[in-house]
């Protein structure tokens, strides 16, 4: 009997991957955790049946959520990551020797433990000495922080279940307060393509836009995420991700990446017309 993983993207669209075997399943206090293995995408990790990470395409997401802000401000020293239980964002951040401290706030300790065991490719740097993992709701954690971080990365699940509070006006306001005077906020911004995800994207952008002087959106193609067309939000008190890109400084680091490069950095902010129109709806 064939086993297939299937994720519903809309009432009329489903996405499927043929599964070789199920490696692990658990119902944690917060959500269902599954690790599956496939020929096409290698091992992959889902929460409540929704795709989080595959070994084959995770590099795209993690390159883009980390290297875009780091190339914009190479002097980032203190970083807060909210979510990111699979460890891929942390892996990319630890490649920067100039970063002094990384606080990672993950609501579900079981996600981290399971990923350490089954996904060492992404979770291999979670025990690095600069990384401090706190098991707490990110919404609560950030309430008590002020002028502490140069970069906040919101590597969250979708805006329901455990990740719901990470898409609220209160949360983004507390992130603003927690950032230093030249701080940067980057978040996964959902997909603009299907109506359900597009609504979440517009809601998040509207809230961030009301707080940060500089607020932009950039994109990447991630094959296993709904529609494949995925957005990220870039918001800052000081740095413009295009005007302030220090390509020479970043390239001099000699970091080998599979997706990100400094030419792509500029190009990824050039959005399709339909996305621009959606974002402009908030201004009308």
Swiss-Prot record:
Q: Which residues bind spermidine?
A: 62, 86, 155-158
- Report if keyword Cytoplasm is assigned: yes
Question: Any idea what job this protein has?
Answer: Catalyzes the irreversible transfer of a propylamine group from the amino donor S-adenosylmethioninamine (decarboxy-AdoMet) to putrescine (1,4-diaminobutane) to yield spermidine.
CDD domains, alphabetized: AdoMet_MTases
- The catalytic site is made up of 155
Q: What are the top taxonomic ranks of the organism?
A: Bacteria, Bacillati, Bacillota, Clostridia, Eubacteriales
What name is this protein filed under? Answer: Polyamine aminopropyltransferase
> Per the record, what are the reactions this protein catalyses?
S-adenosyl 3-(methylsulfanyl)propylamine + putrescine = S-methyl-5'-thioadenosine + spermidine + H(+)
GO cellular component: a single term = cytosol
Give the SUPFAM superfamilies listed for this entry: S-adenosyl-L-methionine-dependent methyltransferases (SSF53335)
Concerning HAMAP family, the annotation shows: Spermidine_synth
Q: Which UniProt keywords apply?
A: Cytoplasm, Polyamine biosynthesis, Spermidine biosynthesis, Transferase
Q: Extract one GO molecular function annotation from the record.
A: spermidine synthase activity
Positions that bind S-methyl-5'-thioadenosine: 31, 106, 137-138, 162
**Protein's cellular compartments:** Cytoplasm
Q: Which organism is it from?
A: Clostridium botulinum (strain Eklund 17B / Type B)
Subunit field text: Homodimer or homotetramer.
**Which residue windows are transmembrane per the record?**
none
Which superkingdom? Answer: Bacteria
